[in-house]
Amino acid sequence: MKIIMLGAPGAGKGTQAKKIAAKYAIPHISTGDIFRANIKNGTELGAKAKEYMDKGLLVPDELVVDLIMDRFKADDCKNGYILDGFPRTTAQAAALDTILHELGIRLTAVIGIKADSKGLVKRIGGRLVCKKCGASFHKEF
């Protein structure tokens, strides 16, 4: 099962992706988690991403795609995965399409989550960040 979960920041992608991942025993892959893991493990891609992040800049699409592609090669992705919040740009979508084609991967589903702007503001405004791992969470959602 190979799923992509799309939606605005705060729409609940991560929350729903975690539930689906647990139910089907597949990894939940988010770009934030990939960045944190690669930085923590001192990988070359992680070091490159950290340079941009430390400057408050967005990590370039090409580097994000490289990190995603590297993650797809992990053993735990052999039976599927749920990709949370990627692609975010047209360029990322085109690159992902190329990667999936090259790797012979067919998606099972693409799920879009919609939320009204008031709900998004409430979710984003109440986000907290774990001091130990850097993951964001919300006490209510």
Where on the chain are the PLM-derived regions?
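Glycine-rich phosphate-binding loop of ATP-dependent small-molecule kinases
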Residues: 1-141
